[in-house]
């Protein structure tokens, strides 16, 4: 009703941007007549003007005034460098981002290009801009591709990659615009706050940040905090013993009800992802291990057994992790990508290693941690882009104070979303998926099938193999990941079939008919790699054959209209045609030239990729070899385009890309992302989801209603079921899961919010020390506070002075400051409480000056070094212990809910007390250490 009365708020918002769009369009002609150098000068002048304004409010006003001109300049630079002109809707997207909102833009609407607008504008402040992507590949791609626009305009562009040294990181963070992944940014922030010298700090103060695929980073990854950890030794045989014991324990068929244990040794709660021993299970374990109590603090076992059971029941090989080089590597449940270097905490990873018979790595202890929620809230300016924000609008608003605005598409969407097909069994579903894939493939349309795990993608692959359908497999297995660019490049070709886990296509558009640009790059890589890249057994050949049918038919087996002599019947390799002799000869000459200059097999694969990527750019280059590489790349691309243009026409006529979803994801948003791969930029396309009543979502969250439905439907397994009640069950299950995970994220956020205030206080204190402006004043401040605390601890103001315990007080002061050994009770017995505090603080300052004089005799400046060392040492050690204590507190307050107490309030109150105690201990330890510090004489001694 409100919508009818007031109109759609989104439409009202968009109307507000229209006058600004018109102003930018009016400026287009004026800007287009400027030379390249004049455009760069404009940038230089704008930057000088804006960065010199120190008042933040006035600087913001200047940015608003500059916006139309800045956007017009970026649009012009993009036309010249990328041959891409920002549409009006993309200008609106840029304004939405500049205002610190989330821009929802559909797949293929050019989100990456939109980001150049607010990034350029905010970089004019000179304070730096971060563009955040979900993986290293996308960060590198965007820095190379969109970075051309910024470099052309005279701004510096940085890139942060996983294997960079601190010096390289510092240099890249100092650039005007820096591209990085969310995890690299977060870990650098934590490492900076563990630095022992100011020179080790790599990041600048945060300013403005644009997050690409914002939902993936701020929502999907928000349940998992970033943790830097150090190793601690734990007995490895306990993991092995627990793994063996878990195999003999029997799982209960149902969960306990009303406190009554079911039959069996343990119960599994898939929803909570937990395993709980029954009384029978406890007894069995205690007997097998010959112990009286699994929770005995001197010899604890419960934790090991629970982890072993979770490894057995809830962590599935090829779904949650894969084995690579004798290591268990985590697979990201949202993207389907492997996450090397990441490990599950609390001994869970060790339990999985024991289960798989792998070498057990040492367990770790948290040294520093932060959640993505609190990390990104450190940015004064935060914005994001995604294809699907509206489903999570409330969470963005509540947690991050980010509004969402839907930016209209440039062209009308022509995609058709076909009705879901639901099957009684999983097997029936997979057969139907294989049949529909085969049918659409035979019609000459490309098909993308999204699966939820490595295991499922391989099951479908075997079914298609039986039907003799050639296809490509893209999942977390290393041999497939290395072919990602190649597989996506040909996923839009006529009759192409691509099976992909959730990683499907984030950041890479599937172009109908095939991507000639990618294919040309890969052709050059295939040609140059054997000659230029160091031999390395790690790397598979870059272009392995696709999984073909026994008949040898290829993608285009039934499409006979590609009129080109060079086209093979059925694309049995990646490339659409054989290159002409002329181009082959040129490539051969180029190869010899490159070997002569770059060395015989002396580059890494990454270096070769970078050189080919640079050649693919349009930015001017002085490097003659890159120019030659660029010419060859262009010729190969043109040759391929001649063939692919026909193929594109055929694919369009056949109906475009068809996307098949094989399971509803826990979040409707991920389903929408998969659908969004089809019908980009007004293309034709279609989508369909195939589901079964045995799918995880329905099984775990569907409740009894779905179980009853299963019994009610007496239909064959390969007969699709259509039922309104079923569709409603499905939607309610998805909403239930979304709410469930939102509550978990909210809880993670609320608990980390308590830690966040403490973290800020500790990190600010550390930064003060690293900058070292006035360390002496800081330490004396600690001492004065300690003297106050000693007086308050030993003097009761309610008692008469003659009853005060002055002797104990003096004794305590001497414990901290041995230089005050001459201090006597009678010196202070006549003083009031305030006078006593002032007197002791005065004595402390005198003693500290005396100590400084002693230390400085050894070496000038040694006292300041000692102050920095002891403060940092105490902060780091006590903070580490505090993190452990807060973890334990969080676990224990959960039980207080049973006593009608709010666990979060208990956590806040006790956490605050523990934090105050930690800071008190830190001050006291520093004072004690400073007075006890005795440098070793630097005389040379003979041993």
Swiss-Prot record:
One Gene Ontology cellular component annotation held by this UniProt entry: plasma membrane-derived thylakoid membrane
Keyword vocabulary terms for this entry: ATP-binding, Cell inner membrane, Cell membrane, Cytoplasm, Membrane, Nucleotide-binding, Protein transport, Thylakoid, Translocase, Translocation, Transport
Q: What is its EC number?
A: 7.4.2.8
Origin species, per record, is Prochlorococcus marinus subsp. pastoris (strain CCMP1986 / NIES-2087 / MED4)
Protein's membrane topology: Peripheral membrane protein
Assembly with partners or alone: Monomer and homodimer. Part of the essential Sec protein translocation apparatus which comprises SecA, SecYEG and auxiliary proteins SecDF. Other proteins may also be involved.
Instruction: Fetch the SUPFAM superfamilies from UniProt.
Output: Helical scaffold and wing domains of SecA (SSF81886), P-loop containing nucleoside triphosphate hydrolases (SSF52540), Pre-protein crosslinking domain of SecA (SSF81767)
> What function does this protein fulfil?
Part of the Sec protein translocase complex. Interacts with the SecYEG preprotein conducting channel. Has a central role in coupling the hydrolysis of ATP to the transfer of proteins into and across the cell membrane, serving as an ATP-driven molecular motor driving the stepwise translocation of polypeptide chains across the membrane. Probably participates in protein translocation into and across both the cytoplasmic and thylakoid membranes in cyanobacterial cells.
Name the Gene Ontology biological process terms: intracellular protein transmembrane transport; protein import; protein targeting; protein transport by the Sec complex
Q: Which residues bind ATP?
A: 90, 108-112, 509
| UniProt cross-references to PANTHER family, sorted A to Z | CHLOROPLAST PROTEIN-TRANSPORTING ATPASE (PTHR30612:SF0), SECA INNER MEMBRANE COMPONENT OF SEC PROTEIN SECRETION SYSTEM (PTHR30612)
Q: Name one GO molecular function term.
A: protein-exporting ATPase activity
* Protein name in the entry: Protein translocase subunit SecA
Which PROSITE patterns does the protein's record reference?
SECA (PS01312), SECA_MOTOR_DEAD (PS51196)
Q: What class of enzyme is it?
A: translocase
Q: Does the keyword Thylakoid apply?
A: yes
What family is this?
Belongs to the SecA family.
């Amino acid at each position: 009703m409100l919508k009818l009365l007031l109109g759609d708020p989104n439409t009202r918002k968009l109307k507000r941007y229209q006058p600004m769009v018109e102003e930018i369009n009016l400026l287009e002609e004026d800007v287009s007549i400027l030379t390249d150098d004049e455009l760069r000068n404009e940038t230089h002048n704008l930057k000088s003007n804006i960065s010199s304004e120190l008042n933040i409010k006035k600087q913001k006003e200047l940015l608003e005034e500059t916006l139309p001109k800045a956007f017009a300049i970026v649009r012009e630079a993009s036309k010249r460098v990328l041959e891409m002109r920002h549409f009006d809707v993309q200008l609106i997207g840029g304004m939405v981002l500049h205002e610190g909102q989330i821009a929802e833009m559909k797949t293929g609407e050019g989100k990456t290009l939109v980001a150049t607008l607010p990034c350029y504008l905010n970089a004019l402040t000179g304070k730096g801009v971060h563009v955040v992507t979900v993986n290293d590949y996308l960060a590198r791609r965007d820095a190379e591709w969109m970075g051309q626009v910024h470099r052309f305009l005279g701004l510096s562009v940085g890139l942060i990659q996983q294997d960079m040294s601190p010096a390289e990181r510092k240099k890249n963070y100092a650039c005007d615009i820096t591209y990085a992944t969310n995890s690299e940014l977060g870990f650098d922030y934590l490492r900076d706050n563990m630095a022992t010298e100011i020179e080790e700090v790599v990041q600048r103060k945060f300013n403005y940040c644009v997050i690409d695929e914002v939902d993936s980073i701020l929502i999907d990854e928000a349940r998992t905090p970033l943790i830097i950890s150090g190793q601690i030794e734990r007995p490895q045989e306990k993991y092995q013993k627990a793994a063996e014991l878990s195999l003999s324990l029997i799982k209960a068929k149902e969960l306990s009800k009303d406190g009554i244990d079911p039959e069996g040794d343990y119960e599994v709660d898939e929803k909570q992802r937990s395993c709980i021993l029954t009384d029978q299970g406890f007894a069995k374990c205690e007997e097998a291990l010959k112990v009286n109590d699994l929770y005995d603090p001197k010899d604890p076992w419960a934790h090991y057994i629970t982890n072993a059971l979770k490894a057995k029941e809830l962590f599935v090989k090829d779904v949650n992790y894969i084995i690579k080089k004798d290591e268990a590597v985590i697979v990201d449940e949202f993207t389907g990508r492997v996450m090397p270097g990441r490990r599950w905490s609390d001994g869970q990873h060790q339990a999985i290693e024991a289960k798989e018979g792998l070498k057990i790595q040492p367990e770790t202890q948290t040294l520093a941690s932060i959640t993505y929620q609190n990390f990104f809230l450190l940015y004064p300016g935060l914005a994001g882009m995604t294809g699907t924000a509206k489903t999570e609008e409330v969470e963005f608003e509540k947690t991050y104070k980010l509004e969402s605005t839907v930016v209209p598409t440039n062209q009308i969407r022509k995609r058709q979303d076909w009705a879901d097909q639901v099957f009684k069994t999983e097997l029936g579903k997979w057969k139907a998926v294989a049949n529909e894939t085969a049918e659409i493939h035979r019609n000459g349309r490309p098909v993308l099938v999204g699966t939820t795990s490595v295991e499922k993608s391989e099951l479908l692959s075997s079914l298609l193999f039986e039907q003799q359908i050639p296809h490509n497999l893209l999942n977390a297995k290393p041999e497939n990941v290395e072919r990602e660019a190649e597989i996506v490049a040909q996923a839009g070709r006529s009759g192409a079939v691509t099976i992909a886990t959730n990683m499907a296509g984030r950041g890479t558009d599937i172009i109908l008919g095939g991507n000639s640009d990618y294919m040309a790059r890969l052709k050059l890589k295939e040609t140059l790699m054997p000659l230029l890249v160091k031999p390395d057994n790690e790397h598979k050949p870059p272009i392995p054959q696709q999984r073909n049918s026994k008949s040898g038919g290829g993608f285009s087996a039934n499409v006979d209209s590609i009129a080109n002599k060079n086209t093979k019947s059925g694309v049995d390799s990646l490339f659409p045609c054989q290159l002409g002799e002329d181009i082959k000869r040129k490539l051969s000459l180029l190869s010899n030239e490159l070997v002569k200059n770059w060395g015989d097999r002396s580059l890494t694969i990454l270096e070769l990729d970078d050189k080919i990527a640079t050649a693919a750019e349009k930015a001017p280059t002085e490097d003659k070899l890159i120019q030659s590489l660029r010419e060859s790349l262009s010729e190969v691309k043109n040759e391929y385009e001649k063939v692919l243009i026909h193929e594109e026409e055929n694919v369009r006529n056949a109906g475009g890309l068809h996307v098949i979803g094989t399971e509803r994801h826990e979040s409707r948003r991920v389903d929408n992302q998969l659908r969004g791969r089809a019908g980009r930029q007004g293309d034709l396309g279609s989508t369909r989801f195939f589901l079964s009543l045995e799918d995880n979502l329905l099984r775990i969250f569907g409740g009894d209603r779905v179980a009853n439905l299963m019994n009610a439907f007496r239909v064959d397994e390969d007969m699709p079921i259509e039922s309104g009640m079923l569709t409603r069950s499905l939607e309610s299950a998805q909403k239930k899961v979304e709410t469930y995970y939102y509550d978990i994220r909210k809880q993670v956020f609320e608990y980390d919010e308590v830690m966040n205030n403490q973290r800020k206080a500790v990190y600010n204190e550390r930064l003060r020390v690293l900058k070292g402006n006035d360390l002496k004043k800081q330490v004396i401040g600690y001492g004065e506070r300690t003297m106050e605390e000693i007086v308050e601890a030993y003097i009761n103001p309610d008692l008469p002075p003659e009853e005060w315990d002055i002797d104990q007080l003096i004794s305590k002061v001497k414990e901290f400051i041995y230089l005050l050994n001459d201090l006597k009770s009678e010196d202070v017995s006549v003083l009031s409480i305030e006078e006593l505090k002032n007197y002791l603080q005065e004595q402390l300052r005198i003693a500290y000056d005396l100590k400084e004089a002693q230390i400085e005799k050894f070496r000038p400046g040694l006292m300041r070094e000692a102050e920095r060392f002891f403060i940092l040492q105490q902060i780091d050690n006590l903070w580490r212990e505090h993190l452990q204590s807060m973890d334990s507190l969080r676990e224990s307050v959960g039980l207080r809910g049973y006593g009608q107490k709010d666990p979060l309030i208990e956590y806040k109150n006790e956490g605050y007390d523990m934090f105050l105690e930690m800071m008190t201990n830190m001050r006291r330890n520093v004072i004690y250490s400073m007075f006890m510090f005795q440098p070793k004489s630097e005389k040379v001694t003979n041993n």
